[in-house]
Structure formats: structure tokens, C-alpha cells
Amino acid sequence: MNKVIIYSKPSCPACKRAKMLAETRKCEVDYLMMGEDFKPKELMEQFPGARTFPQIILNGEKIGGLAALTEMLTNEV
């Protein structure tokens, strides 16, 4: 089973789509919300240079955003 950690922010449609995709693919999902679960400074330390949401970790690897998650989960055998 894949483990997905999604760093999200309020009112982020792509964040919600990433969560829905991961759940549909039966992944274990940790959905973290900025301001509740982490601070912006913590995000910048974890993902230097990140400018978009969501930021996603798949099985311990920083993969980027929704497009990367979609590609990786869709290409699984």
C-alpha cells in the first residue's frame, strides 16, 4: 500500500483532488493543512523553492504536486 502525505492549504481544489485520487487508489493518506498541522516556514524548510500546492510525499519521496501524483499512481502496475 502506498503512503501519501499531502501538504495542503485552505480553499485549494488541487489539494482536494490529490486527496481524492490517493483515497481512490487505496493509499494511506495523511492530509496536512497549513495553519493547523504545519506553518509556512516548516513547509519551506521541507520543500525549498516550492511555490504551489499541494506538495506531496509518496512513499517517503518528495514528488511535487497533483500532476506528479496522478502520473505516478496511474502508471502503477
Task: Mark where each language-model region is.
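Non-catalytic, surface beta->alpha helical segment in thiol-disulfide oxidoreductase systems
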Residues: 58-77
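Short amphipathic alpha-helix with an adjacent loop that forms part of the alpha/beta core around
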Residues: 41-47, 73-76
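Conserved residues at beta->alpha junctions
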Residues: 9, 34, 60
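Thiol-based oxidoreductase modules, predominantly thioredoxin-like and allied folds used
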Residues: 28-40
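Short alpha-helical
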Residues: 13, 38, 64
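Structural micro-motif
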Residues: 47-57, 66-67
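Local sequence-structure signature of Cys/Sec-based thiol-disulfide redox active-site neighborhoods
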Residues: 1-27
